[in-house]
């Protein structure tokens, strides 16, 4: 089931959870979507600023599997 997150801090806390398996990054011309798969929900964060998206990509936990979809 999907859930949408609005805060970057909330997304980072979710990505650091034990049950977080992978992150998919979808880039569109106007926004970037970060999707983290946990055991129960698929959490989505939409960012319109490219610089913030790059910073968030760098600050993802190192143990997660990251896949970029274009």
From Swiss-Prot:
A single cellular component GO annotation: cytosolic large ribosomal subunit
Molecular functions (GO terms): structural constituent of ribosome
Keyword Ribonucleoprotein attributed: yes
InterPro entries named in the record: Ribosomal_eL38, Ribosomal_eL38_sf
Top-level taxonomic group: Eukaryota
UniProt keyword list: Ribonucleoprotein, Ribosomal protein
Family recorded in the similarity comment: Belongs to the eukaryotic ribosomal protein eL38 family.
Name this protein carries in UniProt: Large ribosomal subunit protein eL38
Annotated source species: Timarcha balearica
């Amino acid at each position: 089931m999907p859930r949408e997150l609005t805060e970057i801090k909330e997304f980072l806390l979710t990505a650091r959870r034990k049950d977080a398996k992978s992150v998919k990054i979808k880039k569109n011309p106007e926004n970037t979507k970060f999707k983290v798969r946990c055991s129960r929900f698929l959490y989505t964060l939409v960012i319109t600023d490219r610089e913030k998206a790059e910073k968030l990509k760098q600050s993802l936990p190192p143990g997660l599997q990251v896949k970029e979809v274009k």
